[in-house]
Amino acid sequence: MSDFDALLANYTSKETPKVHGVICKCVDRHGICPTPHLAKRDLRLTLLGNEIYSKVAGYDSVLPGASPLREDVVLKVASATKLITSIALLQCIDKGLIDLDEPVTKVLPEFDQKQILTDVSGSDLVLEPSKTPITARHLLTHTSGLGYPFTHRLLRLRAEVRNRAGVSPSLRVTERYEMPLVFEPGTGWLYGCSLDWAGVIVSRLHGGISLEQYFVENIWQRLGLSEPFPCFNIARHPEYNARVMGGAIQTPEGRLQPKDHWAFDNPEDQDGGSGLSCTTKDYVAVLADLVSDSPKLLKPATIAEMFTPQLEAKSPGVQMLLGLRPAWDTVSGPIAENAINHGLGGVLCMDDVPEIDQPKGMLGWGGASNIVWWVNRELRVAGFFATQQAPFGNPSVTRLVNAWKKDFWAQFKTIDHA
């Protein structure tokens, strides 16, 4: 038993779980044969790539009648939805429907004459006109100036002002995220609703088709997946909903309690930034395509651009990215501050992370339910870690993610890749 296996067994024990259930998968594009100890199970050919690492541990809920976790459980992947939406928007660029660096106002008139929120004084919002049009690149890199109320003080204060005024919050994407910017597009970085708006662009460029249906026709079916497909509004899909892994929340004392509702559950609309439900197989098929020699979803040059640093070194954008390290630290691992950047679709690790044996060149992100995905295009390998637990990046999950990576990379290096 490896150190990670021992830690995983301890953390997912039914009696005193720190994380009630975990799925870890890694795939590559090689067709290589792993050393006997590389995976618990035999090497299996997946829809794309080879599954070279697979561990499933723990239970499907924290309730007394919980069953051992199965790898075909349905997961609410939260902000890991953003990668799928990023790919969808990049497909629009590959098709010539929109350019990466042209203003998106021709598709999103809501972005015409955007204003920048510079202060909130009592109930008064201090606003000034924005001079820079928002582009698809801005949306894909979180440099648009758009945020979430929980990621920026001024947006939080604005939400409080609206709440005191009796403004009822909407769940429609175009109303929920109709908010001012907090900096001039392209001059900073802020985690926010950029990909939710990207989903609206994808829908409008295809005649108003729902984002869910676009994903079915242009992502899931293209990868060879079959029904039931990943979906939004999972309550409307009873056969899929019945397989959802139970959620949990870790108390300040470290105990786990059931969690039935997530903030990203949206019964009224399809958020490109969150809200997707899928299986591990579904998501890993996307990751495998990004490391494939013959990708089905995007042009190779477009995939290469995803892995290109989009923020200037030492720029305000990089400093703002570092200022929100809790949003991505569980994804990146203990990386040096001068080695972090952002690509098209995720945080980009520009150097090795020796503490966990992680090589440079990793693109990744995650989701509030403690989903973590990463792709190393140069080494043609990708990984996926899943549980259904809040809060994101809590110490128990972060330790498991780092230990998983270290276990995988140590074993990956023993393979003959010739």
Curated annotation (Swiss-Prot):
Task: Identify a single GO molecular function assigned to this protein.
Answer: acyltransferase activity
Q: What positions does the entry give for substrate binding? A: 176, 191
Q: Which SUPFAM superfamilies match?
A: beta-lactamase/transpeptidase-like
Keyword field contains Hydrolase: yes
Q: What does the record give as the active site?
A: 79
The protein's UniProt keywords, in alphabetical order, are: Acyltransferase, Hydrolase, Transferase
User: Which EC numbers characterise this protein's activity in its record?
Assistant: 2.3.1.-
Q: What induces it?
A: Expression is induced in complex medium (Czapek yeast autolysate medium) supporting calbistrin production.
Per the record, the domain of life is Eukaryota
Q: How is it used?
A: Calbistrin A has been reported to possess a number of interesting bioactivities including antifungal active against Candida albicans and cytotoxic toward both healthy and leukemic human cells.
Q: In which pathway does it act?
A: Secondary metabolite biosynthesis
**Residue runs in coiled coils:** none
Acyltransferase among keywords? yes
Function summary: Acyltransferase; part of the gene cluster that mediates the biosynthesis of calbistrin A and related compounds. Calbistrin A is a secondary metabolite with an interesting structure that was recently found to have bioactivity against leukemia cells. It consists of two polyketides linked by an ester bond: a bicyclic decalin containing polyketide and a linear 12 carbon dioic acid structure. The polyketide synthase calA is probably responsible for forming the decalin moiety.
Write out the similarity annotation.
Answer: Belongs to the class-A beta-lactamase family.
Mind telling me what this protein is named?
A: Acyltransferase calJ
What is the phylogenetic placement of the source species in the record?
Answer: Eukaryota, Fungi, Dikarya, Ascomycota, Pezizomycotina
As recorded in Swiss-Prot or TrEMBL, the protein's gene is named calJ
